[in-house]
């Protein structure tokens, strides 16, 4: 079992730092809905072994942990990037904008910002370190992944109320067979990402 807290503590020792932040996103590969980015600085003594990559937790557990993380952090920031913005920027640039914005807006400036993924991100006056599979290895990143996913899932649940024929509550905007069939039957919505190939294809076929 990976001790994500030990991973973060070792990084603090190696870099001789006090404040470490973690950042992750949710929804980058989705066909519909926003991309959500979260950054968090945790209290130094906070740890919960249940916390791991948000995708590996059930919704009820994620919500409980979301509330717990909020209570046990020094600060957190969440940015919601609309599907239109994702189309305008492209998914990668939208993610990078979210990381830069949420990290920069933390009330406590981190000595080092851990970011999930493999992209180098340059921030003025803040050192960053990208961690591949960061939500599996870093406690701070795992916490940020929960903040991002719970926030995004709530938005998709609201979309499910507005657009009941699309099944957003179950697939959360991802490219599933059920989702594609609904788009083919009921049409492309404003919340769909028009630059994504499956949406482009359906739009072309139905135009």
UniProtKB/Swiss-Prot annotation:
Recorded GO MF terms: manganese ion binding; RNA binding; RNA-DNA hybrid ribonuclease activity
Gene Ontology CC terms, in alphabetical order: cytoplasm; ribonuclease H2 complex
Subcellular localization: Cytoplasm
Signal peptide (residue range): none
Entry keywords, A to Z: Cytoplasm, Endonuclease, Hydrolase, Manganese, Metal-binding, Nuclease
One Pfam family matching this protein: RNase_HII
Broad enzyme group: hydrolase
Similarity comment: Belongs to the RNase HII family.
Protein name: Ribonuclease HII
Species this chain originates from: Mycoplasma capricolum subsp. capricolum (strain California kid / ATCC 27343 / NCTC 10154)
Highest classification ranks of the organism: Bacteria, Bacillati, Mycoplasmatota, Mollicutes, Mycoplasmataceae
Gene from which the chain derives: rnhB
